[in-house]
């Protein structure tokens, strides 16, 4: 059951853009992980820039070895 949790700075995405993003990500997961559409869930959380350090400290830095795409920045 893949669950994708996207955190990003705020973006002005309308519902159609969010649906297109979800569809594209779903297609990639189906292709690479051989998942069923019904098993995939995707979360989009918009985080204010001044709060990003907390995301880095709790979710990015401790998981650096497990990341399959590492960030090109550090904090």
From Swiss-Prot:
Q: Which residues form the active site?
A: 2 (proton acceptor)
Q: Which SUPFAM superfamilies match?
A: Tautomerase/MIF
Q: Supply the name of the protein.
A: Tautomerase PptA
Q: Which family does it belong to?
A: Belongs to the 4-oxalocrotonate tautomerase family. PptA subfamily.
Which species does this protein come from?
Escherichia coli O127:H6 (strain E2348/69 / EPEC)
Q: Which Pfam families match?
A: Tautomerase
The compartments listed are:
Cytoplasm
Task: Quote the subunit structure annotation.
Answer: Homodimer.
Note the NCBIfam families from the entry.
Answer: PRK01271.1 (NF002324)
Question: In the Enzyme Commission scheme, what number(s) does this protein have?
Answer: 5.3.2.-
What GO CC terms are in its UniProt record? cytoplasm
Care to name a GO molecular-function term for this sequence? intramolecular oxidoreductase activity, interconverting keto- and enol-groups
The gene designation is pptA
Q: Which UniProt keywords apply?
A: Cytoplasm, Isomerase
């Amino acid at each position: 059951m893949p669950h994708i949790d996207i955190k990003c700075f705020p973006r002005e995405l309308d519902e159609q853009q969010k649906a297109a993003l979800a569809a594209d990500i779903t297609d990639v997961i189906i292709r690479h992980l051989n998942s069923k559409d019904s098993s995939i869930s995707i979360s989009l959380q918009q985080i204010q820039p001044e709060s990003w350090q907390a995301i880095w400290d709790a979710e990015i830095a401790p998981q650096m070895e497990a990341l399959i795409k590492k960030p090109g920045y550090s904090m």
